């Protein structure tokens, strides 16, 4: 390899890493206490691979769950199985964060869910929302942690 090729390869690596770093968003911890894991992504379970990370909630339900970045509530699921009370937030960069096994939603989200449950005459709902319906700010409390759905103890599935 000649010097020019090495120089160009190094230049592209530096520019590429700069672009990646300037586009990376700083995400907030969803809790007001340090994160401890109770489950890892890809961990082998009895009948599946775990598709998220589980955060301990100090052994209790009812801890405030904050949004990690601004965005909008793009999906809400309520079910006695799976995530139980689940919340999906889509962020400006296109990523979606999932919050599962929630005890209850914030008032504005809970009001919307209740309205839809009555309209559909069903406790179980799987709602897909438009960006203008329920926008959220970074650090906003959107729910309380819980143990709903297919959960073996209080935690936040993220």
What are these regions (language model features)?
Residues 22-95, 103-108, 122-125, 132, ...:
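Surface-exposed, glycine-biased beta-strand/turn segments
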Residues 1-26, 30:
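Bacterial Sec-dependent N-terminal signal peptides
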Residues 154-158:
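Histidine-centered catalytic micro-motifs
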Residues 99:
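A cross-family detector of function-defining hotspots
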Residues 113-124:
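A solvent-exposed, charged loop/short amphipathic helix patch at secondary-structure junctions
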């Amino acid at each position: 390899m000649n010097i020019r090729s090495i120089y160009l390869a190094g230049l592209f690596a530096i520019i590429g890493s700069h672009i990646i770093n300037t586009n990376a968003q700083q995400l907030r911890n969803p809790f007001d206490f340090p994160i401890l894991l109770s489950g890892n992504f890809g961990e082998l379970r009895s009948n599946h691979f775990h598709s998220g990370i589980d955060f301990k909630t100090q052994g209790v339900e009812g801890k405030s769950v904050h949004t990690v970045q601004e965005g909008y509530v793009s999906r809400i699921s309520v079910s006695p199985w799976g995530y139980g009370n689940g919340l999906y937030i889509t962020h400006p960069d296109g990523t979606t964060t999932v919050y599962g096994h929630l005890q209850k939603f914030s008032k504005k989200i809970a009001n919307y869910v209740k309205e839809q449950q009555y309209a559909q005459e069903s406790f179980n709902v799987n709602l897909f929302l438009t960006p203008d319906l329920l926008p959220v700010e970074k650090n906003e409390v959107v729910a309380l942690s819980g143990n709903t759905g297919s959960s073996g103890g209080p935690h936040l599935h993220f």
